[in-house]
């Protein structure tokens, strides 16, 4: 490993530890179980899963560091000059599915790729972001989520938050449903326009911001009363989450195509989901308002 890779790996392992500790404290009912694994083709990771907690129905916080002699198609499709290069990929990826339908599902990911070829300069980039998927929308939560995102981006330039907010809205779009997965956040990939130190600092800022963005929402909503009907709607909307992850998500596709560990890759899927044929929300209901108001391209900071 290079010095750069060592530094990124040390940060990611520490980030995984800090996020797991914060989520365990907030849940208060159970702890993460760690499953350390190795990849026969090179590398390995630490998968940590929490299930049937007081607050969290299922969640996973995964660290992986994999390497190989050639990039899989999902990583080189839009960068054909990288075909045939050896690679290392490091990242932390997490998804939290709470019990309570009033608590949104959250996702975050930060990652580093480096691709090398003998006689040529290494090519590296960072990626990541975080996004929020509510089932029952709440303006206060949406504004808070985006304020934390904007604050994390601010030291790196005034255009960074709006650019990566827009990319998030575009990326987390379920094309066959013609709707977004959630209310967005930040998404960036192939980041190497700054020097390494600045790019790495930005990745750290995004990784560190996740807990500040998510925990206050959990704390506000985790004790809200909910009905069996609201729970059914949560499970119905989780189906959209599954559809996106299995059809479009780059991380899922990269993991499966590169021979990654299937259990770790699919830890993002919720434990209980339902599909109903041609289901429609009642006009004027909270369920209808989710898609009509919250799942729209919206400047949440302008709502404040």
UniProtKB/Swiss-Prot annotation:
GO biological process: protoporphyrinogen IX biosynthetic process
Chemical reaction(s) catalysed: coproporphyrinogen III + O2 + 2 H(+) = protoporphyrinogen IX + 2 CO2 + 2 H2O
Transmembrane parts of this sequence: none
Claim: Metal-binding is one of the keywords in the record: yes
Required co-factors: a divalent metal cation
GO CC, one annotated term: cytoplasm
Renumbered residue ranges of the record's region Important for dimerization: 241-276
Signal peptide start and end residues: none
Entry binding sites for substrate: 93, 109-111, 259-261
Principal subcellular localisation of the protein: cytoplasm
Function according to Swiss-Prot or TrEMBL: Involved in the heme biosynthesis. Catalyzes the aerobic oxidative decarboxylation of propionate groups of rings A and B of coproporphyrinogen-III to yield the vinyl groups in protoporphyrinogen-IX.
Assigned protein family: Belongs to the aerobic coproporphyrinogen-III oxidase family.
Listed name of the protein: Oxygen-dependent coproporphyrinogen-III oxidase
